[in-house]
């Protein structure tokens, strides 16, 4: 209608819109709760102040947080110390985008998910080593370290299957332990209501290029609830021990660790509301050795690890005659090699991983050709796997 004049004149009007957008550089900055404040006294004196960025785990090559091309949240040691929490599970509740569903007190058992997924769709790492359990993700957060031993926590949002495998569909969480370079001894203890007691300690010995540290912790509580018969059904007991060592020079750095987590807890109605006297025992061990070269055109980062898990679930606590206990044992062995090099167009990384997951169980998997005896029992066997 508005173009009737042009129509009378025998003219044709063509109207078009050309939209042009140029993306020269897009980068998802890592969201960090680690806020560093400049020391104004140094600024006024004219002295330069350098703040080293933390290298986070998000690719096969080490990158600082600002170089990451995906969403990364870093909880620093300062954040961990300032948070009014007693477990890693409670600490993760403070991070947006992370869903924490906890069963029992003091982090007895927790399901953690990222970006609306579930606990089976993310990878859990300890010092960059995948400690995922093929049996279940329910016990993924049975760490061998106490919260007081954590240096920082890195939460990587988004698929990371190319680095950590298919389990990291929606992201990964990496727990990095402290690596003090000076000799020291620390102890801590606390108590609370419902018979709650926590204690722990760490000893660190540093000699030149070598560093060794050993830590342990104990935690227990009577729980806050009882079953219909009046017995405790949310009680909890946990023992943890962790050793790690380092060798560091200009050409090479090597780190190794070994840890265990022993946990017993009344799981109440965790798996079925029909039975209120469930119980679970888990025992996990972790070992790993890593290295990184620092000279040469190509930097290499090999690692080898072994994770062992034993799990016993009791539908009726201490009464196997009412319903047989479920036993599971997993052994995960792995070796990986990552490498990277810098050149004109930036940094290129490549790597490979070989991982073997072995599961034997009384009720999970396929029938075994040769059943295996369950250690510590009289006549129970693993018949599936």
Protein language model regions, located:
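N-terminal periplasmic "start-of-domain" segments of outer-membrane beta-barrel proteins
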Residues: 50-81, 111
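Extracytoplasmic beta-strand/coil segments of soluble accessory domains associated
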Residues: 89, 93-129, 133, 151
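Non-catalytic regulatory/gating segments with a bias toward low-complexity or hydrophobic composition
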Residues: 92, 153-154, 173-175, 245
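Short acidic/polar hinge/loop motifs at secondary-structure boundaries
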Residues: 130-157
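Short strand-turn segments of transmembrane beta-barrel domains in outer membranes
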Residues: 172, 177-205, 216, 231-234
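Transmembrane beta-strands of outer-membrane beta-barrel pores
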Residues: 191-193, 207-209, 218-222, 249-251, ...
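Flexible loop and strand-edge segments within Gram-negative outer membrane beta-barrel domains
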Residues: 221-238, 252-300, 306-331, 376
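Outer-membrane beta-barrel transmembrane domain signature of Gram-negative proteins
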Residues: 306, 323-385
């Amino acid at each position: 209608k508005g173009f009737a004049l042009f129509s009378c004149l025998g003219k044709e009007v063509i109207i078009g819109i050309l939209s042009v957008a140029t993306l020269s550089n897009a980068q998802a900055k890592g969201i960090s709760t680690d806020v560093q404040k400049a020391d104004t006294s140094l600024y006024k004196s004219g002295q330069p102040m350098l703040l080293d960025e933390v290298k986070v785990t998000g690719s096969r090559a080490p990158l600082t947080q600002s170089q990451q091309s995906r969403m990364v949240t870093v909880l620093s040691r300062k954040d961990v110390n300032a948070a009014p929490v007693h477990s890693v599970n409670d600490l993760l509740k403070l991070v947006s985008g992370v869903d924490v569903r906890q069963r029992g007190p003091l982090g007895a058992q927790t399901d953690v998910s990222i970006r609306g997924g579930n606990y089976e769709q993310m990878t859990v790492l300890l010092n960059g080593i995948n400690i995922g359990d093929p049996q279940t993700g329910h016990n993924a957060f049975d760490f061998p370290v106490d919260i007081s031993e954590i240096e920082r926590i890195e939460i990587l949002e988004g698929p990371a299957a190319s680095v950590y495998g298919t389990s990291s569909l929606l992201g990964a969480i990496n727990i990095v332990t402290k690596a003090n370079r000076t000799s020291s001894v620390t102890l801590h203890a606390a108590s609370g209501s419902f018979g709650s007691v926590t204690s722990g300690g760490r000893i660190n010995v540093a000699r030149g290029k070598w560093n060794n540290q050993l830590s342990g912790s104990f935690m227990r509580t009577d729980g806050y609830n009882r079953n219909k018969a009046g017995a405790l059904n949310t009680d909890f007991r946990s023992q943890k021990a962790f050793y790690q060592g380092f060798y560091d020079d200009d050409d090479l750095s090597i780190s190794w660790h070994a840890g265990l987590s022993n946990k017993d807890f009344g799981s109440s109605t965790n798996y079925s509301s029909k039975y209120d006297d469930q119980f679970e025992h888990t025992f996990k061990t972790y070992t790993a050795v890593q290295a990184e070269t620092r000279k040469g055109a190509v930097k290499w980062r090999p690692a080898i690890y072994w994770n062992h898990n034993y799990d016993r679930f009791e539908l009726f606590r201490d009464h196997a005659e009412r319903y047989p206990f479920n036993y599971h044992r997993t052994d995960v062995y792995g070796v990986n090699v990552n490498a990277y090099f810098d050149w004109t167009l930036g940094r290129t990384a490549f790597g490979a991983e070989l991982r073997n997951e072995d599961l034997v169980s009384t009720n999970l998997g396929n029938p075994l050709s040769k059943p295996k005896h369950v250690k510590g029992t009289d006549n129970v066997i693993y018949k599936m796997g």
